[in-house]
Amino acid sequence: MTERVVLAYSGGLDTSVAIGWIAEETGAEVIAVAIDCGQGGEDMEVIRQRALACGAVEAVIADAKEEFANDYCVPAIQANALYMDRYPLVSALSRPLIVKHLAEAARYHGATMVAHGCTGKGNDQVRFEAGLAALFPELKVLAPVRDSGMTRDKAIAFAEEKGLPIDVTKKSPYSIDQNLFGRAVETGFLEDIWNGPIEDIYDYTQNPAEPREPDEVVITFTAGVPTALDGKELSPLEIIQELNRRAGAQGVGRIDMVEDRLVGIKSREVYEAPGAITLITAHQELENVTVERELARFKRWVDQRWGELVYDGLWFSPLKNALDKFILEANKHVTGDIRMVLHGGRAVVTGRRSEASLYDYHLATYDSGDTYDQSLARGFIDIWSMPAKIANMRDRRLS
């Protein structure tokens, strides 16, 4: 029986050429699997037909937008996931979803191999292969670009030789990855970290200086899950899409950073994530209102570690799964509304309300109606400062 390979297919040059290359090198049949994570661009049916025209024996399209929003983006919002305090894990979140579908397709079609088009310098090779090792360790992984020296020039020559239906005349100077949660741009002139980004590289966001009028929005959360905009109930997918539009129109969510890659190098990345940044900012503020101080302090550490695990390709690890449960528990009272003004590239919180609020006006006010017993402060301070007081008295005695 002929072996089968499941290929993570994007419709681009490298993975289109990989179909024929894998067939020639291994003699295996190639099944192309393309996952719709809300990246937009070409129609998915056009991509499917291209895979077949390039030699795939079967081409599968999975509409995973709802799944991506519910099972990957929402947990990231609940975890306030910002790698290095800035990057909302745009690409990193989609990789375990793609891995899950690749593993399912491999089982369904009886494949013995899985292939991807990642290079040997990026994080994605690790995310794909670590995920596959966790879900389907029996599979052999092929990486033509990394392991077989498939350069762009070689890929173009192969496509022309075989008459593959791929437009190879247009080449963006950038490497771009995008999905529902945002857009990542790298390489080209951005590799000189002194060069400022130009407006041409942006697609999800307008120039922050252009909109004259601000946009006010009220975001509703239920147990940390976004459930409504301006009082209208919507799915997480619809909310992210709408905030991509509205926050993007105000230039919100532009990020230009030098990032510590998993593979040991620093890389300059430009991101656009208008919906993600708006939702994470709103969620953080609602946590400030509804989560007790010690839990909030510890959750900040958990959130950071959760983001690092996802960035590092360990979505399916025991630690990440355990942290998921903690984050869900910590979000059980994160229910309420956050009002924000979107303008000038910023999403600014201007109001908060929650039935689960820990903010007590009568305890916080300095006006009449204050119920805080200030006479308790002196005793509290004496006890709170006692360990440091005793230690310093000892140090003076011994010096």
Swiss-Prot record:
It is found in: Cytoplasm. Gene3D superfamilies: Argininosuccinate synthetase, chain A, domain 2 (3.90.1260.10), HUPs (3.40.50.620), Single helix bin (1.20.5.470). Its main location: cytoplasm. Pathway: Amino-acid biosynthesis; L-arginine biosynthesis; L-arginine from L-ornithine and carbamoyl phosphate: step 2/3. It comes from the Bacteria. L-aspartate binds at residues 119, 123-124. InterPro entries: Arginosuc_syn_C, Arginosuc_syn_N, Arginosuc_synth, Arginosuc_synth_CS, Arginosuc_synth_type_1_subfam, AS_cat/multimer_dom_body, Rossmann-like_a/b/a_fold. Keywords: Amino-acid biosynthesis, Arginine biosynthesis, ATP-binding, Cytoplasm, Ligase, Nucleotide-binding. Pfam families: Arginosuc_syn_C (PF20979), Arginosuc_synth (PF00764). ATP binds at residues 8-16, 117. GO terms for molecular function: argininosuccinate synthase activity; ATP binding. Homotetramer. Belongs to the argininosuccinate synthase family. Type 1 subfamily. This is Argininosuccinate synthase. It comes from Thermobifida fusca (strain YX).
